[in-house]
Amino acid sequence: MRQSPGVSRRALLQRAAALACAGAWPSGADAQALAATTPPSTPPPQGTVPAPYTPRVIDAAGAQADVALLERALKAIHPGLTRRSSAAEMDAGFSSLRASVQGPVGELDFYRELSALLALVRCSHTKAEAPAAFERWRQVHPSHVPLRFRWIEGRMVVVSCADAALPAGSEVLALNGRAVSDWMQTLGRLVSVDGHTPWARDANLADDGDLMGSGFDHFLPCVAGLPKRFELDAVRLGERGASRLSLAPLSFEDWLKLPNGSRTWRANFSEATQWRLLRPGTGYLRVGTFVNYRKPTDAQALFTRAMLDLQAQGARQLIVDLRDNGGGSDDAALALLDHLALKPYTYQRAMRLKAVRYGDLEAHIETWGDRQALFHAPLSQFIRTPEGWYERRAEDHPEHLQPRQPAAAAFGGEVVVLTGSLNASGATMVVAKLQDMGLARLVGGRCGGSADGPTAGRIFTVVLPSSGIRVRIPLVFNHMTVTRYDPRGGISPDVLVEETVEHFRAGHDEVLAQALKTLGAA
């Protein structure tokens, strides 16, 4: 992935991120090319007053032109635009967006309204990136709430805080005079998740490996501005009454240093995959992410090593922990399936595009690879369906569309998979396939994502010329080979275990306890 003239670091990052469902990940040389474009962060000198950020104002004509381009692009390209919201609902969303730009508009206000419209699509891969200058500013200037949290039983529970006066396990009731439940509802309408999965939305507000760490902090400035202090009403651990704390915001770089349990921002597959014998006869395999392009490794070899090691230790049962996994590279996801499969299987039934010709929209699309081959591919590469889809040919995409064989070291014993609300994209595809093939029992929380497949794969980045805001639009509906799924999105486990505040404070893993109970004696 050499950087060609005029291709931004954002384009390179988008290439890597968008390949998550396409199974074509950057090589080591590509990763070096990406790293070479990384600009150094320059923190403000010690003792200086942080420079304020002044949002750019976009004139009405420019904002209206951006909205018109976005509407045209979404309707021409997106294969799932009306999959979870009706055409009438989307038209109402576009009308609301147009109404918000009848006069000059600040870039953060415009970004907020764009995000609200894109969230209506109910696709986690369809979203706008924050204005680039603002994102750079936030890296080293304080704007993040100085804590990490989990949303448990409708309560904001502290995982860690920059101020020792608010220990882990404390509960935040209000932020700057407003109940945190109201903040979650307001900010939640800006978060893109698959289908009607509010549990996934809440999880992404607390943790998001794609945006600036959490949906809550990512979108808060678009609603509340940039306060110099955060006034928190909280019940500190061990106390009964609420206390008022005044906390200074953190830069994104400092916020990332806060402990966050097992969840790592932008984790890598090779580092987030561990295994051990949990008890005699029962193995444990944690796969925290399928992202395998930043530090690529041979996923097949890694899982073969894991399975052989666990079996050598006498494992006859296996717990696969996917709770923190939001998806990633297809090579890692397919390798896990290959090592759990007992017979040949086909991953997807179809890869469908809405269009393969884009007219003058091409001038506004940033992508990677051979543009001639992408925008003017021979029509013979596709099968036109009676419904109007363009389907990719199985012989051109055998890994996804043709039968796969179990790995030689595939685990042949009893399997339980631990699930959670952070599951999305490729992680949900794996869970759906395991459930459909009867290869595992699911224990834990409800998954996000789409069991019948996401709209993902290659992603076009449409650059809105007046605002400069970049919008990600997926090209492909990856239709899974599954016989049952919830059309509203997500997956319900066989044994539903919802985390409680009591268990969190005690450090008790009830999901794992229920998994061991489900397996019984090894």
Task: Walk through the language-model features, giving the residues of each.
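Conserved acidic, small-residue-rich alpha-beta core segments centered on
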Residues: 170, 330-505
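Sec/Tat signal peptide C-region and signal peptidase I cleavage site
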Residues: 28-30
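Flexible, low-complexity junctional segments that flank or bridge functional domains
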Residues: 2, 32-318, 322-353, 359-370, ...
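N-terminal secretory signal peptides
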Residues: 1-11, 15-25
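Short linear Ser/Thr-Pro motifs
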Residues: 25-26, 425
